[in-house]
Amino acid sequence: MAGLLSCIGITAQAQDTKVEEPKGKAILQVFTNLHTGFGADNDDRGFELDRSYLGYEHNFGKGLSVKGVVDIGKSSKVDDYHRIVYIKNAMVSWKKNKLTLNGGLISTTQFNFQEKFWGYRYIMKSFQDQYKFGSSADLGLSASYKFADWISADAIIVNGEGYKNIQVNDGFNYGLGVTLTPVKGFQIRLYGGLNEAAEDGKKNIVNMAAFMGYKTEKFTVGAEYNHMWNAS
């Protein structure tokens, strides 16, 4: 009996002192294609490297992690055949139960949900990214909270110029979002944002978005409505 109690005590002590092991992972995404024309456009062909993401993410344990990512891609500021490097993410994240906080050069929440739901960025960007409704990353803070399995909310405040132009003008970009999952596979995303005018005489830019989609292992379908006011 004494030996059995001793074993139980040692096991319990080992479980109490167990700590989460730090973990890290490399990030590598490459978007490329092979294209060719037909007929009169037959000379327009070849391989194209559209964009690459290189980075590293490290989890220190107890919900604390850091991530750094560089974006290598095209820019309207240089020749089409040249590539330019930007820092896309340099951020710290902390997760505690249902709360998540992010700070630094973070991923924005304006259309991040739609990108993940779509899942085929290598084929086509999401609508808001393609038509410049906002930036996919910016310098600032964000917070999200999962109230229940079917509802979560998030808030963000960033500079508003994106990760390629860090605080060129004054003003902030504020955003609020709600994600609903009424049944498995079916999700609804609502988002509203306000980007403060950086110059006197100009109006604030307002963004509204509504998305709903259904996803199974065999197919994905979705619909999205976006509206932007006072865009220059």
Segments from the language model and where they lie:
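Active-site-proximal beta-alpha loop/turn segments in soluble metabolic enzymes
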Residues: 156-165, 195
